[in-house]
């Protein structure tokens, strides 16, 4: 993969105000509408792909099948950020790539792209395949300045991207999330006064990808899905749900998480 907007690379030495300003510049360039040829049917998985056995395996629908790349991060000795990228085509893992970078930026909510982004760029730049979609463990538009990690990376490479987070960074659910939700439920996340987006704008969804049969005794929390770049909020939820197969997490980031664990 090739970086298209190098001016948005995480730069060393920026203070938090400069980082926030850079994120606003990225959000101004980001496209939160659909600009791709993807559908849930084209990227959907009937069964969870295997990580090792499928690597390099043949596909059933040929080269025309979309390439979906999952991205996840881990840390080594609290000093190095490690990023894992796993490319899937038509249910088979076709490539994996890793990147790393020093942890030079402290943890600040909303500024994770400057802490972890260099490792992500390193991993994605190592891929020989060109992704049709990035599925990033982290936020996209559900972000104080509409520029979470998925947006930052999507704009940097100008590739359709979605963010999948396990907790809600900001925004207000359109309906209560206190009680366990049935599988398949979606609740819109609307912009509020903690965000740069217009109040009430739908910036993503709480997506209940899976649920236990008796959620009153044991339940699964929803995912928080948001567009990163060149994908709308509704389509982002559609695409992520299509790749969740038998697990809560979408297959691309689930496999990237497993690979990241192997690297640390």
Swiss-Prot record:
Binding residues annotated for Mg(2+), in chain numbering: 72, 137
GO cellular component, one term: cytoplasm
Presence of keyword Nucleotide-binding: no
Keywords for this protein: Cytoplasm, DNA damage, DNA repair, Endonuclease, Hydrolase, Magnesium, Metal-binding, Nuclease
Protein family (similarity comment): Belongs to the endonuclease V family.
Function, as annotated: DNA repair enzyme involved in the repair of deaminated bases. Selectively cleaves double-stranded DNA at the second phosphodiester bond 3' to a deoxyinosine leaving behind the intact lesion on the nicked DNA.
Protein's UniProt name: Endonuclease V
Annotated organism of origin: Halobacterium salinarum (strain ATCC 700922 / JCM 11081 / NRC-1)
Gene expressing this chain: nfi
């Amino acid at each position: 993969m090739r970086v298209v907007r190098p001016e948005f690379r995480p730069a060393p030495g920026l203070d938090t105000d400069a980082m926030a300003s850079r994120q606003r510049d990225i959000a101004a360039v980001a496209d939160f509408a659909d600009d791709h040829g993807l559908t849930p049917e084209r990227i959907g998985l009937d069964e969870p792909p295997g990580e090792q056995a499928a690597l390099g395996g043949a596909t059933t629908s040929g080269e025309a099948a979309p390439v979906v790349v999952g991205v996840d991060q881990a840390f080594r000795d609290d000093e190095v950020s490690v990023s894992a990228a796993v490319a899937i085509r038509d249910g088979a893992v076709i490539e994996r790539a890793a990147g790393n970078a020093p942890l030079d930026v402290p943890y600040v909510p909303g500024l994770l792209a400057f802490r972890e982004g260099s490792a992500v760029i390193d991993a994605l730049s190592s891929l020989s395949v060109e992704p049709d979609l990035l599925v990033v463990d982290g936020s996209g538009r559900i972000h104080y300045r509409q520029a979470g990690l998925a947006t930052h990376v999507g704009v940097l490479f100008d590739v359709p991207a979605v963010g999948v987070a396990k907790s809600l960074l900001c925004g207000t659910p359109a309906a209560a999330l206190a009680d366990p939700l049935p599988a398949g439920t979606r609740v819109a996340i609307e912009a509020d006064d903690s965000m740069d987006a217009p109040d009430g704008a739908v910036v993503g969804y709480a997506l209940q990808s899976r649920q236990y049969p008796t959620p009153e005794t044991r339940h699964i929390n929803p995912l928080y899905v948001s567009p990163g770049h060149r994908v709308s909020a509704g389509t982002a939820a559609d695409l992520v749900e299509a790749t969740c197969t038998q697990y809560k997490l979408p297959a691309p980031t689930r496999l990237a998480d497993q690979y990241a664990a192997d690297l640390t």
